[in-house]
Amino acid sequence: MLTIKDLFVKVESDNGEDREILKGVSLEVNKGEVHAIMGPNGSGKSTLANVIAGKDGYEITGGEITYEGKDLFEMNPEERAREGVFLAFQYPVEIPGVSNATFLKAAVNEIRKHKGMPEMDAVEFLKFIKEKMKMLGMDQGMMNRAVNAGFSGGEKKRNEIFQLAVLEPQLAVLDETDSGLDIDALKIVAGGVNNFRSKDNAVVVVTHYQRLLNFIVPDFVHVLVDGRIVKSGGKELALELEDKGYEWVKNNEQFVMTNE
């Protein structure tokens, strides 16, 4: 589904100089899989998520990303979304004056139009939305509120997962969705992601801590350090990181040299 080959990315730093963030990242994600990207702060995790989604501000200096056999760099963010790429932001954006209902109905019908399907009318959409809200234990009053405006941190993250459930993308990229959540909110968010998982889609979970992976169990774990994937493994790798810390891989020359 998603193939990243030898990806190099740089950004312009505050002093105007270019800074290389990703330094030859390669990754293969197939349908039905959940991949966790872990790493210390500043390792390039969010950069990778943002580049997949097509966020502005990054310069691709090498490599390629293909999604369902198509060149992702040839698509703008809106085209990627219509093709089924979804990004749950680390810091969800507020859209004052636009209700969740209006936003999601427009998004759903845009995707349906892209697939050659008829638009949902108001009655169909309301029934569809109520089913999703019930599944996630969401208050129906959320639909009348402006997108993320005045929401608490936990409400914003739950709203992102609600959008995931409604839009039903093929590839979901979750950028530190667990950031700032208490254990109850974390369980709700993880439950929404687990309900989404199927043999027909894939999930990339970007996280700093192992605790999210207690609830969303990954098939593969990749450790990103200084813009490089220095180690990959199964779910047990996350537990090993929790026990030994990131210094374990940062200071182990064998890991770094193997991936240079």
Where are these regions (language model features)?
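Conserved structural motif at the start of ABC-family nucleotide-binding domains
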Residues: 2-4, 20-22
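The feature captures the beta-strand-to-loop junction immediately N-terminal to the Walker
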Residues: 38-40
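ABC ATPase NBD Q-loop/coupling interface
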Residues: 64-80, 148
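ABC-family P-loop ATPase nucleotide-binding domains
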Residues: 93-170
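Walker B catalytic motif
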Residues: 173-177, 184
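Helical segment within the ABC ATPase nucleotide-binding domain
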Residues: 186-199
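Conserved beta-strand-loop-alpha-helix hinge in the C-terminal portion
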Residues: 220, 224, 228-251
